[in-house]
Swiss-Prot record:
This is Serine hydroxymethyltransferase, mitochondrial. It catalyses: (6R)-5,10-methylene-5,6,7,8-tetrahydrofolate + glycine + H2O = (6S)-5,6,7,8-tetrahydrofolate + L-serine. It holds the Pfam family SHMT. It is found in: Mitochondrion. The keyword tRNA processing does not apply. GO terms for biological process: glycine biosynthetic process from serine; tetrahydrofolate interconversion. Its cofactor is pyridoxal 5'-phosphate. It comes from the Eukaryota. Disulfide bonds: none annotated. GO terms for molecular function: glycine hydroxymethyltransferase activity; pyridoxal phosphate binding.
Length: 485
């Protein structure tokens, strides 16, 4: 028996060593195939102009935490109330993240709380809705083709429910004025009194103008609704005080953390605390209960263990957002967007609402002989990443008349106004090329998808497209990505 035990020791030692070697190697050694994909994506990001307004380049410090030991820990529950042991440092990280979030937006911890465990923006909205509504309650949000978001309850005019939120709740959209491109607050006020929603969402994903939060508050009060402001796209601008803040007028504020805020891919739900109202006759105080209902909705209502590496990385991003450099960055984001828009207008493009107050622009291509899907495709071929987008009046999200572009990502890489003017020139050239290529699409292509595939093949075969791609790649590659300086 002793001999058998002695013989097993070196065998177990070799097995243990083999396991340690497996988990201690870097990805290029363990999985060359995946490493090649990663390398290709790194190269694509460096040598492409990123115009998608919901994208950004996060900092190396944030990346340090995303790939850290913080991801190893399970921690269902909240700081001081976990269902697992060993969370003393996870508690510190989450509490620090919450404190920094409130501080960044100038919020009194006695009057506001924040949940930082939601995994991303759409789930965060669902969690917030579920905290204050029952299944079948009524919700109003900006219609998707008018600049809203799927998570605001999108359904087709026919009644087909696209977002599951429109299945859980009874949703009705509000719209922009199609002449001005500005939200039609008067019609919203009238409709909300008839529809009587439980929640009105003040938030957008493709709307380039400021939101009138005071007007939203008045409308919500007029129909007895909660006002939920979704500032996912503009949270960085709000933090830097370069655009109006929703907090003064809102009951709940949700946001993603990876867009203009330039953090990891996560979300936050801010909610009011303290006294909601006081009965004038009896003096009885009615408190807000969001701290209980929203936190319960996140856990255990919808999620299990939070992503501690993301929460820790978010804490770092929130600290960086308090710096003067971040404020200057956000000012440049807006300045770049305005210069970008002005140059596009000079070149004959039409912009929904005529311009921008924030970080994005929505191009109306309906009178240019090309659609958003084809323009997105040819831009990708020349190393410019943008996205097709619906505009008011569009019937199809796959072949819409709009193109959405934004400035946060390339401003992070050092673009100034003159650089975005150059990008406008590239887009103009791409439109001219795409119109010519569209006329050459295969006659055998009968449906819209086949025609788009034919168009992409023509792009691949086009020498002018290839030449433009090389020019863009060479130019943008001179701008650093985070970590190169």
């Amino acid at each position: 028996m002793m001999l058998l035990r002695a013989a097993r020791v070196p065998v177990l030692g070799r097995r243990f060593l083999s396991q340690q070697q497996l988990i201690s190697k870097h990805v290029q050694e363990v999985d060359p195939e995946m490493f090649r994909i990663l390398s290709d994506e790194r190269s694509r990001q460096k040598h492409s102009v990123t115009l998608i307004p919901s994208e950004n380049f996060t900092s190396k410090a944030v990346m340090d935490l995303l790939g850290s030991e913080m991801q190893n820990k399970y921690s269902e529950g909240y700081p001081g109330e976990r269902y697992y042991g060993g969370n003393q440092f996870i508690d510190k990280a989450e509490s620090l993240c919450q404190a920094r979030a409130l501080d960044l937006y100038g919020l009194d911890p006695e009057k506001w709380g924040v949940n930082v465990q939601a995994l991303s923006g759409a789930p965060a909205n669902l969690y917030a809705y579920s905290a204050v509504m029952e299944v079948g309650d009524r919700l109003m949000g900006l219609d998707l083709p008018h600049g809203g978001h799927l998570s605001h309850g999108y359904q087709l005019p026919s009644g087909t429910k696209i977002s599951y939120i429109s299945k859980y709740f009874n949703t009705m959209p509000y719209h922009v004025n199609t002449e001005t491109g500005i939200i039609d607050y008067d019609t919203l006020a009238m409709t909300s009194k008839l529809f009587r929603p439980k929640v009105i969402v003040a938030g957008t994903s493709a709307y380039s103008r400021k939101l009138d939060y005071a007007r939203f508050r008045k409308i919500a009060d007029g129909c007895g609704a909660y006002l939920l402001s979704d500032m996912a796209h503009i949270s960085g601008l709000v933090a830097a005080n370069v655009i109006d803040s929703p907090f003064e007028h809102s009951d709940i504020v949700t946001t993603t953390t990876h867009k203009s805020l330039r953090g990891p891919r996560g979300a936050m739900i801010f909610y009011r605390k303290g006294i909601k109202k006081v009965n004038k006759k009896t003096g009885k105080e009615t408190p807000f209960t969001f701290d209980k209902t929203i936190n319960f909705s996140v856990f255990p209502g919808h999620q299990g263990g939070p992503h501690n590496h993301t929460i820790s990385a978010l804490a770092v991003a929130l600290k960086q957002a308090k710096t003067p450099e971040f404020v200057e960055y956000q000012k440049q984001v807006v300045s770049n967007a305005k210069a970008f828009g002005d140059e596009l207008l000079k070149r004959g493009f039409e912009l929904v609402s005529g311009g921008t107050d924030n970080h994005l622009l929505l191009l109306n291509l309906s009178n240019m002989g090309i659609d958003g899907a084809r323009l997105e495709a040819i831009l990708e071929k020349i190393n410019i990443a943008a996205n097709k987008n619906t505009i008011p009046g569009d019937k199809s999200a796959l072949f819409p008349s709009g193109l959405r572009v934004g400035t946060p990502a390339m401003t992070t890489r050092g673009f100034q106004e003159q650089d975005f003017k150059k990008v406008a020139e590239y887009i103009d050239n791409a439109v001219k090329l795409s119109i010519a290529l569209k006329s050459q699409e295969s006659a055998d292509a009968k449906d819209v998808r086949s025609k788009l595939n034919s168009f992409k093949q023509l792009c691949d075969q086009s020498e002018p497209v290839q030449k433009l791609a090389e020019e863009v790649s060479s130019w943008v590659g001179t701008f650093p990505v985070p970590g190169e300086l």
